[in-house]
Amino acid sequence: MTLSFITRWRDELPATYTALSPTPLNNARLIWHNTELANTLSIPSSLFKNGAGVWGGETLLPGMSPLAQVYSGHQFGVWAGQLGDGRGILLGEQLLADGTTMDWHLKGAGLTPYSRMGDGRAVLRSTIRESLASEAMHYLGIPTTRALSIVTSDSPVYRETVEPGAMLMRVAPSHLRFGHFEHFYYRREPEKVRQLADFAIRHYWSYLEDDEDKYRLWFSDVVARTASLIAQWQTVGFAHGVMNTDNMSLLGLTLDYGPFGFLDDYEPGFICNHSDHQGRYSFDNQPAVALWNLHRLAQTLSPFVAVDALNEALDSYQQVLLTHYGQRMRQKLGFMTEQKEDNALLNELFSLMARERSDYTRTFRMLSLTEQHSAASPLRDEFIDRAAFDDWFARYRGRLQQDEVSDSERQQLMQSVNPALVLRNWLAQRAIEAAEKGDMTELHRLHEALRNPFSDRDDDYVSRPPDWGKRLEVSCSS
């Protein structure tokens, strides 16, 4: 089957990119590819059998027209000016059979005009982390970019140490970022901001294109998508680590996996990025940061969208966030209805977990085994203050009884939303260290496990992290 690529971005937004081709690595070789995703995208298996090929930037497929995008942004709350694809190249936009499109974005593809002081490369460590994280999030049901392939090489890349150069093929319906809009707003080119908005609406919100109120309705949906995404992050204990405006997806996708982390111990102020000295991007601050970023996007639209309309959309953010968060947390607790005491019960559990440094994922998974008429629970042994747990657990079981739902039905619901497996940093690190020694077994094994996060397991993937694996802070270097 021949893949079809189109050039909408190149044709319709000429001010937003520089055309250039990838720079191949030395002795590049394909070490992993996503068979399930490749099948979804109707990619012939033969493309994965001919060396690095397109996956290593050595060849282009017919119809591809590679380019590096320019954008700007606020980083850690400070205007950073022009940024852009410093090591990534958009190879093309695949046209799928249903009429939708999928960007093919090659990360680590070499120098671009937007590399600034960088070398245009990515390292094996970071490409493995992004591949694992994006696929983990996908199978958790959270909107995200996807990973299609990883190529490693003999090219040395200099970070804190010398690491092997690598490339990741990332795919997504769009790589539109808040930073694209900021770039032209701060260059005082509002007509180009409007062109970006029109492009987004035409291709991703086409049902609004003929509406005279399209910009307000579109921005309201961007706000809602962002609020929903952040709510989902919070419910699974995901910390992004670097929520700069240039890392914010217009479509509400999780984008740019760098120093991310999933909670081990429940620590609301968890900081996964060792460069985040002020804790701006701490776990509990993510909802506020996302709203701040939306305000920056709204500012770029103010030349052609009424400020009152923008503010109305921004004002809806918190309610959308709380609605999505509340719905999912009630499911995680096994509540079939909404009762006034639900928030208090959840907050009391969080307080107890924070005091005891309880494991976030394991706590909710074990809670899924609760029998409403039995005071016995395997979760009890996870707490030192048994009296405090017993008091909370008795009230929790009383709340479950109000719903008049069988244990089996409720447990099934809870186990479908409380994962047994999340991508803990130590699991990723173990796969990385093996891969850097040439052994890809653990990389493939972990990828396969992450496809079924809600299935029961009895291996170390679902155990508490070892001492060395706790509080692994990660840098932005990739």
Curated annotation (Swiss-Prot):
* Cofactor(s) needed: Mg(2+); Mn(2+)
- The EC designation for this entry is 2.7.7.-, 2.7.7.108
The residues that hold Mg(2+) are: 247, 256
Which species?
Escherichia coli O139:H28 (strain E24377A / ETEC)
Q: Which reaction does it catalyse?
A: L-seryl-[protein] + ATP = 3-O-(5'-adenylyl)-L-seryl-[protein] + diphosphate; L-threonyl-[protein] + ATP = 3-O-(5'-adenylyl)-L-threonyl-[protein] + diphosphate; L-tyrosyl-[protein] + ATP = O-(5'-adenylyl)-L-tyrosyl-[protein] + diphosphate; L-histidyl-[protein] + UTP = N(tele)-(5'-uridylyl)-L-histidyl-[protein] + diphosphate
List ligand-binding residues for ATP: 84, 86-87, 107, 119-120, 170, 177, 256
One MF term in GO for this entry?
A: ATP binding
Q: Which domain of life is it from?
A: Bacteria
Q: Kindly give the InterPro entries that the UniProt entry links to this protein.
A: adnlytase_SelO, SelO
User: What is this protein's function?
Assistant: Nucleotidyltransferase involved in the post-translational modification of proteins. It can catalyze the addition of adenosine monophosphate (AMP) or uridine monophosphate (UMP) to a protein, resulting in modifications known as AMPylation and UMPylation.
The entry's family comment says: Belongs to the SELO family.
Keyword terms of this UniProt record? ATP-binding, Magnesium, Manganese, Metal-binding, Nucleotide-binding, Nucleotidyltransferase, Transferase
Active site, UniProt feature? 246
Official protein name in the record = Protein nucleotidyltransferase YdiU
What Pfam families does the record point to? Answer: SelO (PF02696)
Residue ranges annotated as transmembrane are none
* Top-rank EC class of the record's enzyme: transferase
Q: Which gene encodes it?
A: ydiU
